From Swiss-Prot:
Transmembrane segments: 194-204, 233-243, 248-258, 271-281, 285-295, 315-325, 329-338, 353-363, 368-377, 390-400, 405-414, 432-441, 448-458, 471-481
Protein name (record): Surface lipoprotein assembly modifier 1
Free-text comment on this protein's domains from its UniProt entry: Consists of a soluble N-terminal domain and C-terminal probable beta-barrel in the outer membrane with 14 predicted beta-strands.
Annotated organism of origin: Haemophilus influenzae (strain ATCC 51907 / DSM 11121 / KW20 / Rd)
Keyword Membrane part of the UniProt annotation: yes
Alphabetical UniProt keywords: Cell outer membrane, Membrane, Signal, Transmembrane, Transmembrane beta strand
Annotated stretches, region: N-terminal domain: 25-192
Length: 481
């Protein structure tokens, strides 16, 4: 009897005699957007399965080395067939290198094992291609349909994965298999749900208007005096994706943020931004293009009043790209262009450019590092307000013993203005900033973990009016729904 005949007979008998088992999802924690979100991915909590290879119902166990196994092709084939049927990635990766050199190989069995191997290595797109080729040859194999659906799920081809899981659920499969299929379908539905996040922090500003040292003068010009303010900042974000065929999606993003000071209301502000666009995603890669419009309301600052008024609007487009290079390294980039218009300060009308890149390293489950660089250019009608800003960032997040977590972010930037101002100085600044945040993972208030942050800012400049430093301590509270 040929290898292919044995394989087909085994497939047929296994489908009728035993329910097929399914493997636990294995994917990089992909992470698209903010860092806390990149580290979390909606996925089903699937049961662990016992590898079928080298186990049986007898108390005695078969023990054989890889070298000895290579001398027995029949044992390799007898082990590989149930391994692919049972979606046993570990067994397939053990046996596939031993099966590939054999002179007589079944092409279908070989390609199936290679598809599983690609999935286990994280090459989900290539794995999907292999599974689709296999499935085009044998559409009646339920284990193959399941594994295709799983690979599509891992590759973020949501619509195709949902279609395959729904078809699989309609088959006569075991109740345990139905439960696992429904876990996948539930996870797919969650991917298209609204993601809502909001939070606020208390503010106690001792130098809200970034004033230099008291008494700073340039000729007959005297710098403004410090002002203090107490209040809170707040933000809210809502985002929804709609999955489209072939890994594409549409996306809606709504963002709002502001500051409210009860004892110095002329510094109150509110910003709102809305964007809608298209994107493409796999398990490791995401690309999106989002046209947006943004409005700002502001009370006016030192020369303003207590009521906020429409201050400016900005419309443009943003291109985001995120790619996991492997399980530990991720690179994210963003390009943005906007046209900015002011209600009264027409001399600030112009356009703005942003280019940003961040490299993330997940050292282990409780530690991450990141570094980034940003370039920002503001073009305004009056050239003394136009500038270029170049920034570098470093960050470190750590989970410590006793439930303590910390996050440290350091920034350094250079800002250079295009022309001299009224005093005759072409401003060049060096900007330093740091934020240290600490919280206890087991301390919650209504399901929310408060975080204590200390921030420090310092600006040195060739323009004495724009040199200052300040620090503040604040409590940060946020929640994702």
């Amino acid at each position: 009897m040929s290898i292919q005949t044995k394989f087909i007979l085994f497939l047929s008998s296994s489908l009728f005699l035993t329910p097929y088992s399914v493997a636990t999802e294995k994917s990089p924690q992909p992470h698209d957007g903010r860092l806390d979100e990149q580290l979390h991915l909606a996925k089903p909590n699937l049961p662990q399965k016992t590898p079928a290879l080298l186990t049986n119902n007898n108390p005695s166990k078969l023990s054989i080395t890889k070298e000895e196994l290579a001398k027995h092709p029949d044992l390799i084939i007898r082990g590989l067939i149930p391994a692919v049927l049972q979606n046993n990635g570990e067994a397939v990766q053990l046996l596939l290198p031993l099966y590939q050199p054999l002179p007589k190989k079944d092409p279908f069995l070989l390609e199936w094992a290679e598809a599983i191997d690609l999935r286990e290595k994280g090459y989900f797109s290539d794995s999907v291609k292999a599974y689709r080729h296999l499935f085009s040859q044998k559409t009646d194999l339920l284990p193959l349909r399941y594994q295709l659906a799983q690979a599509l799920f891992l590759n973020n081809d949501n619509e195709a994965a949902k279609d395959q899981f729904q078809k699989l659920r309609a088959e006569q499969v075991s109740s345990d298999s139905v439960k696992i299929i429904e876990q996948y379908l539930s996870a797919l539905n969650q991917r298209d749900q609204w993601k809502i996040q909001g939070g606020f922090s208390f503010l106690n500003e001792s130098n809200i208007n970034n004033a230099p040292k008291a008494g700073t003068k340039i000729g007959n010009w005297t710098a403004w005096e410090k002002e203090s303010a107490r209040g809170f900042s707040y933000f809210g974000n809502a985002e929804k994706k709609w999955s489209l065929p072939h890994n594409h999606f549409t996306k809606l993003s709504l963002e709002g943020s502001g500051k409210y000071y009860w004892d110095n209301k002329k510094y109150n502000e509110f910003n709102a931004r809305a964007g809608v666009g298209l994107g493409y995603q796999t398990a490791r890669f995401e690309l999106s293009l989002m046209p947006f419009t943004e409005k700002r309301w502001y009370a006016g600052g030192s020369s303003g009043g207590n009521a906020m008024k429409q201050y400016s609007k900005n419309s443009g487009a943003r291109l985001d790209l995120s790619n996991w290079l492997n399980e530990k390294w991720q690179i994210s980039t963003a390009l943005e262009y906007g046209e900015q218009r002011y209600e009264t300060r027409k001399h600030l009308n112009g356009n703005n450019y942003l280019a940003s890149a961040t490299l993330l390293y997940l050292a282990k489950s409780g530690q991450y590092w990141f570094g980034g660089a940003d370039y920002n250019r503001e073009n305004t009608r009056d050239l003394d307000n136009a500038y270029q800003r170049k920034n570098v960032r470093l960050g470190w997040g750590q989970e410590w013993k006793a439930g303590i977590s910390t996050r440290l972010i350091l920034n350094y930037a250079r800002r250079a203005y295009k022309e001299k101002d009224l005093i005759g100085i072409r401003q060049k600044n060096k900007e330093y900033a740091s934020v240290l945040t600490i919280w206890h993972r087991n301390f919650h208030i209504w399901g929310i973990t408060p975080k204590l942050s200390w921030s420090y800012q310092k600006v040195t400049s060739n323009h004495p009016f724009y040199e200052y430093d300040k620090n503040r301590i604040y409590v940060e509270i946020s929640k994702t729904f």
